[in-house]
Amino acid sequence: TAVGNEALGANTTGAENTAVGSQALDANTTGTPNTAIGYNSLTSNTTGGSNTACGKSALQNTTTADHNTAVGNNALLTNTTGDSNVAVGSLALDASTTASNNTAVGRSALSALTTGTQNTAVGSLSLDANTTADNNTAVGYGSLSSNTTGTRLVAVGMNALASNSTANNNVAIGNNSLDACTTGTDNVALGYNALGSLTTGQYSIGIGTNAVAAATTELYNIGIGYNALLNEASGERNVAIGHAALEDSNGGTGNTAAGYGCLRDNTTGDSNCAYGKDALDTNTTGSNNVAVGLGALTGNTTGGKNTVVGTEALNSANIGNTVAIGYRALYTNNDTGYNNTAVGYQALQYNTTGAQNNAFGRQTLEDNTTGSNNCAFGYLSLQRNTTGSSNTGLGHNALSLNTTASDNTAVGFDAMEDNTTGTSNTAVGKDALTNNTTGGFNTAVGHLALDACTTGDNNVAMGYAALTDLTDQGNTTAIGNQAGENAVGGSNTFVGYLAGKGLSSGCNGQSNTAVGRDAFSGATSGEQNTCIGRNAGENITTGSNNLFLGVNAGTSLGPNGAINTGNNRIVLGNNTTAEAHIKVSFTVTSDERDKADITDFTKGLNFVNALRPV
């Protein structure tokens, strides 16, 4: 079909051709099937087939090329042998000669291309400077408009990658994304103005409106989210994920921020990691911090080397070298509370100026404000401590009610649980010194050791239930399981299993000494007794100033049998004692003060002379 002056004028055997317009398909001889609509469209084609040209001079110079489509004034104007091209729009692909497999849609799209292949340009002026580059995709007005030889580029959006000339392997999706990039390679921008100022920088990713918008020559920056890394113009190797993450950073290097507003105010701080909404959001120059959780380290500006994990942990401080892990751990810590470590829910929550504290466990050292050099390990250990310092609580509830007391050590479940102001105590074992409140300088080692002691001072109890009933007396020492268990008096010394145990609860004897298993174990009262040896003085209940020396001394197995009461007695050995040795003789004094029932001697000298001594 031919309509127009010289349309299909030279055709010989070409079939299924359509020519509409003056000189349309004028030189065609055997080419088939072609469609040409417009003045001079496909006018030079001879044997090329399956071409479609619509518009003045469209595909005008094509001779033997196949499968081309040109719609628009001068579209594919200079193409000669290039195949499988699509050009839609005035001047689209108008400089192409032998290039193949290109698609250009829009005025002047790919208008400078000569030999480049497999390019796609959709939008006016898109890829309009491209000459020999291959494998590029540009969608949007002016996208990749300056590219000449850069390859493997993807630009979607008005002016996307508009300044790119020779750079390769960039992806820009969004109006003005990567629009200043000239030679920078291997960048990805997704969102309005993402990586918009980058010129020669490489290996960066910006996803979101204005993401990494100010960067120019930097490397390895990643910004994902609205305004993420917005102002970064010199720092490198930063990662920002979230709305306004690292928004004000400019010069910081090696930072990672994931979460809304985290590290928002950072300027030159380096090597920080922030995960969670507003984590480290006011940090400016602080470096080497780790903050994980909503509002974690949110008050820090210049402090460095902090590790914070948990919602609002270390929320108020601008300080360094601090560890807070757990919800609101070190929540109120201020700028002078330094070198603290808090691990656990609300651990050291209210600390303000206290320094060099260690808290591990839920609510450990929770109420501490100014106390320093404390160590708390275990649920609620040292929970109520406020100003006390140099305390160590290890175990569930250990020293949990301590407030202002210092220099205490409690190890074990409920050890020194009730202590408030008692100082310089040591308790090791479950319930050891658990009821102590104000007593000081006590040492309790063993389950229930000094368990009932409240205000007593200077006591030592070592062994299960040793001195367990002692409450307010002091200066007592008990070593051995259940040694002094029922004793409530002071200044006693008990060494050995059940030594000084007492017949029943409430034994109030004082200043007694018992050494040996079961020694003085049946007493209820009595003072200044000394029992040394297994079972020595075992049966005495209320006597005072007695001395029992040797195994079973004073029992039914001893001389004169069991002694239950009495004062000022001395028992040496037991019924099996064979000999008693002493290097010198005993000195027995005769003193009127030690005698009773004294009467006059009236017998006279004759009676004395008559005596016959044997």
Report residues per predicted region.
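Glycine- and small/polar-enriched repetitive beta-structure motifs of secreted/surface proteins
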Residues: T1-D591
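Intramolecular chaperone/auto-protease modules of tailspike-like proteins
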Residues: L195, L450, S590-V614
